[in-house]
Amino acid sequence: MNANKGINKRMVVGLGMTGLSAARWCQRQGYAFDLCDTRSELKNADVIRSGFIGSELFYGEAFSADLLKKYDQLIVSPGVALALPEIQQAIAAGVEITGDIDLFKQTCNKPVIAITGSNGKSTVTTLVGELLQAAGKSVAVGGNIGVPALDLPE
């Protein structure tokens, strides 16, 4: 699947580690995008603005369903609940919802080992990475531990 097919306006929702990673990924792809966060205060707003010139930044009261419905795609960070009324209204209006892992799997052309479950994921992930490195393999470990998926080497 082409991550850009039919998408003209993107919004990165949630500006923690994963959201900023998604924004950097959009930059590397040459995509136009804006940024928003549900928090009423963003202590690093100036840093975000200067790092993503050409993108608009919305947060606090500016975060609304009307804002989100203006976009073709929302790249929603895992820390932002999809059950939020604003996001649910955007979904109802036909806005595509995706996340960093979806974008990663659409664009990654390297072998991937995905580890899921309730308990022990970080430990198993770390051990698998170390075993593969010990076997002489080129390995990048990331996702919800350490490096966000979209910041992993290509």
Which residues are covered by each model-predicted region?
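Phosphate-binding loop of NTP-binding sites
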Residues: 27-28, 65-69, 78-154
